[in-house]
Amino acid sequence: MNYTTVLNQVISIVNRAGNRLIAEWQRPDGPRGFYDKADVDTEIECELRPALLDLLACDFWGEETGSKLTGNQHCWVVDPNDGTADFLKGLKGSAISVGLLSQGRPVLGVVYAPVRAAGGPDCIAWAEGMKTIYRNGAQLASSLANASLTPEARVMVSSAASRKPAIN
């Protein structure tokens, strides 16, 4: 299977679902939900599930709608709003995360943050067979071994990082 071809289609599907997250963010009364559960999470996953399964019929594991695991070699893994609790607190940066596993091994991934504190949407994407990962359509360095942080660089960590410094 050519995962790079599938990747472009997944990016389109996830971008469309991102419009729902943007609309929820812009609601006059703020996003619907409480603590770490938001209505939009289930709505997005219900949009993603059939679109992804139409693209590649296989197993599915969703954070909101549950799983259907039959032993198929492929499995979609979806978190429709990674960062729901912060999203509901009014903090930008949550993301729609979609992965594809082949025999339990990641072969494709898309992380799309349509509402960010620093500018417009951000999409990180990768598929097996690609030489590097892509951010918003542009190649990123595949090795960070010789990279260094600049004063302008941003390092993203969980908002819970200060409560769990050992794992962050």
Regions found by a protein language model. Give the residues of each.
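N-terminal subdomain of lithium-sensitive/metallo-dependent phosphomonoesterases centered on the IMPase/IPPase/PAP
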Residues: M1-N81
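Residues embedded in well-ordered beta-strands
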Residues: L7, I11, D59, C75, ...
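Residue-level signal for inorganic ion chemistry
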Residues: A17, L21, L52, T84, ...
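Solvent-exposed alpha-helices and their adjacent loops that cap or buttress functional pockets
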Residues: L69-T70, K89, A147-T150
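Short, conserved acidic/polar surface loops in the N-terminal third of protein domains
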Residues: G71-Q73, F87-K89, P121-D122
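Glycine-rich active-site/cofactor-binding loop and its immediate structural neighborhood
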Residues: W76-V115
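Acidic beta-strand-loop-alpha-helix segment within the catalytic core
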Residues: G99-N168
